[in-house]
Curated annotation (Swiss-Prot):
Transmembrane segments: none annotated. It comes from the Eukaryota. D-glucose 6-phosphate binds at K164, H194, Y195, L196, G197, K198, E232, D251, K350, Q384. GO terms for biological process: glucose metabolic process; pentose-phosphate shunt, oxidative branch. The gene is gsdA. It comes from Emericella nidulans (strain FGSC A4 / ATCC 38163 / CBS 112.46 / NRRL 194 / M139) (Aspergillus nidulans). This is Glucose-6-phosphate 1-dehydrogenase. The active site is at H256 (proton acceptor). One of its GO terms (molecular function) is NADP binding. NCBIfam families: zwf (TIGR00871).
Amino acid sequence: MSATIARAEEQQNGSTVELKDDTVIVVLGASGDLAKKKTFPALFGLFRNKFLPKGIKIVGYARTQMDHNEYLKRVRSYIKTPTKEIEEQLNSFCELCTYISGQYDQDDSFKNLAKHLEEIEKNQKEQNRVFYMALPPSVFITVSEQLKRNCYPKNGVARIIVEKPFGKDLQSSRDLQKALEPNWKEEEIFRIDHYLGKEMVKNILIMRFGNEFFNATWNRHHIDNVQITFKEPFGTEGRGGYFDEFGIIRDVMQNHLLQVLTLLAMERPISFSAEDIRDEKVRVLRAMDPIQPKDVIIGQYGRSLDGSKPAYKEDDTVPQDSRCPTFCALVAHIKNERWDGVPFIMKAGKALNEQKTEIRIQFKDVTSGIFKDIPRNELVIRVQPNESVYIKMNSKLPGLSMQTVVTELDLTYRRRFSDLKIPEAYESLILDALKGDHSNFVRDDELDASWRMFTPLLHYLDDNKEIIPMEYPYGSRGPSVLDDFTASYGYKFSDAAGYQWPLTHTTPNRL
């Protein structure tokens, strides 16, 4: 009953209204790294494909003093233009862009921004404003208060897009939410976790619930373990100051990987509405106990074996006595009928041997009969790079003898959908925010439940100074104990069939 009432209220206050006309996007932090690498390229991608509202204006706001021409020069430098056509489109895009400089904690600065917004909106019927906070968390609260006090539209819809991190633990997250509450309704807040905008992550619901053969085996009776892996081949590269404050668990696992886990584990929502989907995700989180230290290993990268790559603590921006983990593997457990007893293994690390994010679902062994020693089936979802889904399965090797070989059913997106462009995650999420669709954004109770899971572990690691991360070489797979750790939770790595994907050669596995 209450949920129905809430959704009715949302429709009345405009939170689910698609913004089609009379819209301004304000990018706060317009001269920063996030705006340069993600926000402006995404806005240009939407503009190129005609997904932005008609007559939209894009206002940049930052502390950096620069005139209009200097600002446009920066915007152009953010975006690649490999063809003449794209260069002409960028010229048109720049005509939508203006810039205002100001401080983040001064009324006069935001009054000046409000005056600029009113000037460019003077011929509009409504003042719909989307505020994109591409800002460090230290100024979130101050800026949100200033926006509400000075720049909130009198006649139109206001939305605020907030980037992670949403706090450092449960209490700081709650403090942040409490500070936002007086000024912004929950339905006006869009908390971005860009993994929810990735094509393969968005495909999880369709794949699970739109294919009965998956849905029927998606439980503890058929699945032995689930792995969610995030690997980066580079280190902090001069960003150690930021990273050392948060570490790999806060940076990747409490948000990106946990969001993927909830989509894998949730029950079928009753509809595709944002609230129904997020209700099911929250139910999964509430069925999970806090992560236990005994279910965790942490590491920190050292020099590469050839000495060409520096150790984490050799980064000038990192404290020499840092205990910050750059690698973590941990196991989460879901206490419900579907998943009780199935370990969810999450692994994330920097300075590893490759760039990869994937989901690996390993099915149970064939327990008896003539095939009892055959390799396990696996469903692998490659999130990035080279988006794909493949099923590792056993097949008879062509020939006169009864030999088996591990092969795969393979859906590689760039081959199957070669004529379609996979959108960038930020393009997808900004478009969702313009539409008022919260499905791929993080709700307040969802955020609370995720921090409840991780905060005890984070405090345990922070408070116990004697806990030192295991060192692993830059460019390796991670700490040397990793394989033993995953094996202790049931994961079976099998190279008996000489299996490779993509397939390059075949070695039979004789029965």
